[in-house]
Regions:
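Acidic, Mg2+-coordinating catalytic modules of nucleic-acid enzymes
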Residues: 214-227, 231-405
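P-loop NTPase switch/coupling surface
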Residues: 2-14, 19-20, 404-405
């Protein structure tokens, strides 16, 4: 569905337009040209004296008679010119009313989504009654709400023997089984490749369907994937990269700018399987996690491009052990301190590290650590996280080769 290519004249009567094709397929020959031309030929433009134009034309007629015989020019008046079929084909188009009112506008003045749906509807008419129809649609989600995207998929699949969609929409992709999706990627050699999705044993089809939008889709659509052990890491690392890029853009970049999608693995036992899945799709895969047993560490390293593993038991301890007292006190001042923690810590600044540890434990997976990092200065963010952000930038944006002198 390309509005600039097809929809610009879909509902016109020009040769080759979708409406013209439908009329020919249905063997309808509109007998309107002669009557339309005759009606327009009898129509005089601005003939009403109240419009003021007839008086001007009368003055021209009087002035003309001063110079030439009357038979040379009589009664100037305005009419529609170029009354030919080809001219009418170009200027006639359908008007459509939208909303609950009666106001109509040319179809090409409708919104992009409306035009796309018009084109799809007309293509469906062309396809009806034909055998072995193949529908190939590029980005059908453009300017279309989610419920309509799903409707498009189901209607097109019913209508055609084979349907091919290219899409970046989770609402489109989740309508297909994993084995029906092919991931396209162009390598550095310029060759376009396709890879199928083979779910690892730890990812059951039910889980894949239930968590497709929230966990799998974004990573499928990106070139690079950062697999985080849990929700806390999945929120904290992007927040740190974004904050550092604001403070020192010459050294750091946000994960979004690097083309990295962050995926919550849901536990360290899932990292290796998910890493193998996305690596098989030709993506650069990175992982971040807490200290792991040697066997699990080796399995993860074998499945990803690079593993970032810190030495603490959890990321909350890593952050609180490597930040400043000023950063913790500033964050405490900005918090609406929970009632149950007010009782345990009447003066939280006196024991800021322990108080925030309890606070983060209650906000596990709820962006508590990410909110803390987002208010830190560069020196207040742990060295390990800063080094990880620098390493990711170096991996995704290798330095340019020196120019020859």
């Amino acid at each position: 569905l390309r509005s600039l290519r097809t929809a610009s004249r879909a509902l016109s009567l020009e040769h080759g337009s979708l409406l013209d094709i439908i009329l020919r397929l249905k063997e309808i020959r509109p007998q309107m040209w002669e009557k339309t031309i005759g009606d327009l030929n009898q129509f005089t433009v601005a003939a009403d004296p109240e419009l003021g134009l007839s008086g001007v034309l009368k003055s021209i007629d009087v002035a003309l008679n001063r110079y030439v015989p009357r038979e040379w020019g009589v009664s100037p008046h305005l009419k529609v010119t170029n009354l030919t079929r080809e001219n009418l084909r170009k200027v006639i188009s359908a008007f459509i009313a939208t909303g609950e009112g009666t106001h109509s506008a040319p179809f090409y003045r409708q919104g992009t989504g409306t035009i796309n749906m018009l084109v799809l509807a007309m293509l469906s008419l062309i396809a009806e009654g034909k055998q072995n129809v193949i529908f190939a649609m590029e980005e059908p989600e453009t300017a279309i709400p989610p419920y309509a995207q799903k409707r498009i998929v189901h209607e097109v699949r019913k209508l055609s023997a084979q349907s091919i969609f290219s899409s970046h929409s989770p609402y489109i992709l989740e309508e297909f089984r994993a084995e029906e999706i092919g991931v396209l990627m162009r390598g550095t050699d310029g060759v376009l490749k396709q890879a199928g999705i083979e779910l690892p044993p730890s990812v059951k089809p039910k889980r894949y369907r239930q968590e497709f939008r929230t966990r799998f889709c974004e990573a499928l659509l990106s070139r690079r994937v950062l697999i985080a052990e849990g929700a806390t890491e999945a929120g904290a690392i992007p927040a740190a990269a974004r904050r550092l890029s604001e403070l020192d853009p010459a050294t750091y970049s946000s994960l979004e700018a690097l083309g990295i999608s962050t995926l919550d693995a849901g536990g360290d036992g899932q990292i290796a399987d998910l890493g193998a899945l996305y690596s098989s799709l030709g993506k650069s895969v990175y992982a971040v996690c807490d200290q792991q047993a040697p066997a699990n560490q080796a399995a993860i390293e074998a499945a990803v491009t690079k593993l970032f593993m810190h030495g603490e038991s959890d990321i909350e301890k890593l952050v609180l052990s490597n930040t400043t007292q000023a950063a913790m006190e500033r964050f405490i001042d900005a918090l609406s301190w929970p009632q149950h923690l007010k009782t345990a810590f009447p003066n939280p600044k006196a024991n800021a590290s322990e108080a925030l540890s309890r606070y983060f434990a209650g906000k596990k997976g709820d962006l508590g650590v990410a909110e803390f990092i987002a208010q830190c200065e560069e020196s207040e963010i742990p060295d390990w996280i800063r080094q990880m952000c620098r390493d990711l930038r170096a991996l995704c944006q290798p330095p340019e080769p020196p120019t020859a002198s």
